[in-house]
């Protein structure tokens, strides 16, 4: 298009947090975003600035439910095709050390339950990073929301979520990289993705038991990767979530894995993943521990 604008029409997955390196490479999700949408996207880069604007439909939505003691009761039953979806993202990188940006998502209900109810969702994010040197970077993101009263279901309709990350490369420590992360999410925050779960499709997460109330969930996470040579890589992760809710135990998850790069196009990976939700959680929430062993073959074309 004119003025060097990149324009896209169709279906795509948008992930601004991933673009800025705001979650660990083996993790599946950002706090918010990273979902399919159908529509129009325009992107413009000029100098050290980048801007993206989106108009779309059919974006992912979440239907909050509350536990009535016997079953989960949906708040509204809204669907993804009941919302118009508008997004604006701007970021600025003046030099190799510092970057800053902001994102806004506006979900406006215009059909069905989303139109008939007060169910709009406005989500705003501010993110930044500072590299002390090429191997150490401090970065993070802060979200705040305004959600419709009907969708909030009687709980806080202006929730917050944020995380801070210290990213240390293996070039500094020699034997491993380190990803140290602290995250805090209000329990009424709308649209939280599963946090710190492995990037392999359907997976369990320490935030799966997050309740809907006016408290906040705190998540600590440590990730480490060891690149031994061109063939062998190992990694490990530990994450723990405190839901700040009486009767709900903390969730703890740890993972170890090894990857063998057989050829430039073929890799084999073996992973052990363990999660413990505690033993005394209320009916309707996960309890006990579980684990899996996963063998994965990746072929690149």
Model-identified regions with their sequence ranges:
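Hydrophobic, well-ordered secondary-structure elements that form the walls
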Residues: 180, 224, 258, 269-270, ...
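Outer membrane beta-barrel
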Residues: 1-69, 80-99, 129, 139, ...
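Sequence/structural signature of outer-membrane beta-barrel proteins
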Residues: 12-29, 56-80, 105-115, 143-154, ...
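C-terminal structured domain segments
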Residues: 251-274
